[in-house]
Design a protein with these regions (language model features):
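Nucleotide phosphate-binding/pyrophosphate-handling subdomain across enzymes
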Residues: 1-64, 86
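C-terminal helical cap/extension that packs against the catalytic core
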Residues: 55-109
Length: 110
């Protein structure tokens, strides 16, 4: 059995992210070991109101959340990341890593 399990999902709303992280939390618990890492970002030129909600969910439901860039389109990637971070409660901030470069964010998680 591999010590690492990787799941890829296209959760692009707060409801979808909540569902996938809840399922993954149960999967980690069933394995009896490991931690849940979430690597995600929000696309640019899309609904900005979901960004802080998704940041809050990722920080709350993951052991570690890596916030990264995800197709910023015409927006500044750092602005998107800052809007995601705005939803992270101070007590969860220590669980969050910022890595704007998506490839580096994934490498850091695995």
């Amino acid at each position: 059995e591999s010590p690492l399990a990787v799941f890829v999902d296209y959760a692009h709303t707060d409801d979808a992210l909540r569902r996938v992280l809840t399922l993954m939390r149960a999967t980690v618990a069933a394995r009896g070991k490991g931690r849940l890492w979430c690597v995600f970002g929000c696309g640019g030129d899309r609904d900005r109101t979901k960004r802080p909600k998704m940041g809050a969910l990722a920080a709350e439901l993951s052991d570690v959340a890596i916030i990264t860039s995800d197709n910023p389109r015409r927006e500044n990637p750092r602005t998107i990341i800052d809007e995601i971070l705005a939803g992270v409660r101070p007590e969860w901030r220590s669980r969050v890593i910022i890595e704007e470069d998506r490839a580096l964010a994934i490498a850091r998680a695995v």
